[in-house]
Amino acid sequence: MAPDFPWLTAIIALPALSTLLIPLLPDKEGKTVRWYALIVGLVDFALMCFAFWQHFDPQATEFQLAESYRWLPSLGIQWSVAVDGISAPLVLLAGFVTTLAMFSAWQVNQRPRLFYALMLLLYSAQIGVFVAKDLFLFFLMWEIELIPVYLLVCIWGGKRRRYAAMKFLLYTAAASIFILVAALALSLNLPGGPNFDLGAIAQQDYPLGLQMWLYAGLLVSFGVKLAIFPLHTWLPDAHGEASSPVSMLLAGVLLKMGGYGLMRFNMELLPDAHVRFAPLLVILGVVNIVYGAFSSFGQTNMKRRLAYSSVSHMGFVLIGIASFTDLGINGAMLQMLSHGLIASVLFFLAGVTYDRTKTMVLAEVGGLGQVMPKVFAMFTVGALASLALPGMSGFVGELSVFVGLASSDTYSATFRTITVFLAAVGVILTPIYLLSMLREMFYTREMDLSCDLGQPTNVAIAGNAPVCFGNDCVLPSNAIYEDARPREIFIATCFTVLIIGVGLYPKLLMQMYDAKTQTLNTSVRQAQAIAKQPSEPIAALQAPELTMPH
């Protein structure tokens, strides 16, 4: 194909247009549609890999693979898509996780056609968010993504699925209003009339007052998606009720939209305001790390514990973005990509465990390691990656953020010391709540064979003998659990190979965005150098005047 082939448009359109053929597929049980959706996902992911391999230059800092088509010219709206160093890796992450999430959904037998149609539509919307070069198009893709997620949680979720789905919708839809307001304010203040193009907006110097107000609004919008405290409460509910394939997308891709938005809009378009808000981001990041870690201890539901773990890990993204160092911003990007892989495999394995035990309550399982050794081994690797074991991707991302903040000359030594210390407390807590979860799930508890055998529970046993925990005993028939199937081993292996590969050779991903993050940091450092007195941000919060086109 010619180099000017519309790669990104094709990548966005393929999954969405493929849903039109799903009603024509022959079977209603889902055997055909699941393979159809998987093939579409694989083809789309292959298109991404080929397009970036052939036409993406990681050393270039400008937009690449750019396409622009007139859509609503009178309003300055175009179908404009492109990628650069911070969007291309996230596009690949979305394609990788979504394809494997569809492969993991083999057990879905309730309305499978609708399920896979929504998964493919979500696939397109996710890619659209990361490649949109037009602010209005970004907002449109951001809103489209809400619809399939809401339906996927509401229809295929747990007992409280409607509550969780509605909470997610209300939080995200309400917060996204600020994205629309920011898009209108930035485009209407450009010379020559409304223009939603990111390149044109990035070249414009906006008044500090306008930047401050828009930054605050966008921080709320992206903070909801990134699960920043106290805007995070939708996440544990959504994870607790969503099916595991949907949880993989919530943790692996949707959370990253918030981090991407902060880097793309708050940092790149509003650098003067970013300088003023950066200390707040660091504080919020520390709160996320510590609060998420402590909250995980009190969770009896496996997926809710993993959800609060995600809240904790997203704190490193905030700190890295506000570090004013190349290493810290690189660490924030790597943390997003690494967490996307690690959280996805953990939620997948939580689903594998639920398929056998039919419970997410940690107190109702135990001793699974002896009857499901393969699941135990895979879960252990995922947990070790999540607690940032050296040699795995999580370690490199978190270490880069720590060193980046500690070496930043923007903050005082006292501020840096306190921040690093508190963040380290959260890091220390991570292995405690993760390893305790593994102990509850997989290690056989102390057996008492003298107890009454009349009370069977949902706890697994080892071998053929009854197992008693206090007054609760398990009969042998209750403990027949199938170990991991080849499909499940393949999915977990795909994630594990990347997690270890990036941990051992982080340049594999960092080379894609290093040049771009350096450019971002240079721009905010320049804004920092010309920043006015510290008292001015407060005065700058006077309501700005918007220039309306004649």
UniProtKB/Swiss-Prot annotation:
The chain crosses the membrane at residues 5-25, 36-56, 86-106, 114-134, 135-155, 168-188, 212-232, 243-263, 277-297, 311-331, 332-352, 375-395, 418-438, 489-509. GO terms for molecular function: NADH dehydrogenase (ubiquinone) activity; ubiquinone binding. GO terms for biological process: ATP synthesis coupled electron transport; electron transport coupled proton transport. Its main location: membrane. It catalyses: a plastoquinone + NADH + (n+1) H(+)(in) = a plastoquinol + NAD(+) + n H(+)(out); a plastoquinone + NADPH + (n+1) H(+)(in) = a plastoquinol + NADP(+) + n H(+)(out). Belongs to the complex I subunit 4 family. NDH-1 shuttles electrons from NAD(P)H, via FMN and iron-sulfur (Fe-S) centers, to quinones in the respiratory chain. The immediate electron acceptor for the enzyme in this species is believed to be plastoquinone. Couples the redox reaction to proton translocation (for every two electrons transferred, four hydrogen ions are translocated across the cytoplasmic membrane), and thus conserves the redox energy in a proton gradient. This is NAD(P)H-quinone oxidoreductase chain 4 3.
